[in-house]
Design a protein with these regions (language model features):
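Aromatic/histidine-rich interaction motifs
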Residues: 130-168
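N-terminal leader/targeting and assembly helices and adjacent pre-domain segments
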Residues: 1-142, 187-193
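Short Cys/His-based metal-binding microdomains
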Residues: 153-189
């Protein structure tokens, strides 16, 4: 389901396309719910493979959404700066271990709500981690810090508010789940980009 603020905020064709992209990501996440609600075998490797079949497409969808947000907001084609397949390959073992550990705990203890929350968090964390590699490479030489706005008002538990050095920033330029917005400060100017 698309967050309410998205329905209120987006009115132009481009904005509606963005809203649709968010909805597609939500549909990917709904597959996790469907998985969690059905019966499972005791074969951890088999179950992990099924979860990864959901997580990899959702990871790519989430990444593509962030690239679109940056292109719309900053006119920077960040997807050309990041070799997505290469980074995903480098992170494959680590990512699959995280997913396997959570899947194993789910199969053993059966807490589907906790499992869905954990997988959503893994999806958000890994996407932002990969995405930021490209974003920081693009902005680190021209910007020195960023100002995060909306975090306090949005009440997002993952976000902070105020001035943050570029090297310490852990958010994408726009966080679609809570409307936190990051403005990058260009060195030697009073401008935020």
């Amino acid at each position: 389901m698309v967050p309410l603020f998205v329905k209120k905020r987006y009115n132009t064709p481009e904005e509606k396309a963005l809203s649709n992209a968010i909805e597609e990501l939500d549909e990917d996440k709904d597959k996790l719910v469907e998985y969690a609600e059905r019966p499972h075998s005791a074969d951890i490797d088999l179950e992990t493979k099924q979860v990864l079949g959901i997580m990899y497409p959702a990871l790519t969808e989430s990444y593509n959404l962030m690239c679109k947000l940056v292109k719309d907001e900053y006119d920077i084609n960040i997807s050309k700066k990041i070799d997505w397949d290469k980074i995903l390959y480098e992170k494959q073992d680590e990512f699959e271990k995280i997913v396997k550990d959570h899947t194993k705990a789910f199969i053993l203890f059966g807490d589907d709500n906790k499992f869905i929350r954990q997988m959503s968090l893994v999806l958000d964390t890994e996407t932002v981690s990969i995405f930021n590699k490209g974003m920081y490479e693009e902005l680190k030489d021209i910007c020195d810090y960023a100002i995060v706005t909306g975090a306090v008002e949005g009440g997002c538990p993952k976000c902070f508010h105020g001035e943050v050095p570029i090297a310490e920033l852990k958010l994408p330029p726009y966080h679609p789940r809570c409307e936190c917005i990051v403005r990058y400060h260009e060195k030697g100017t009073e401008e935020l980009v």
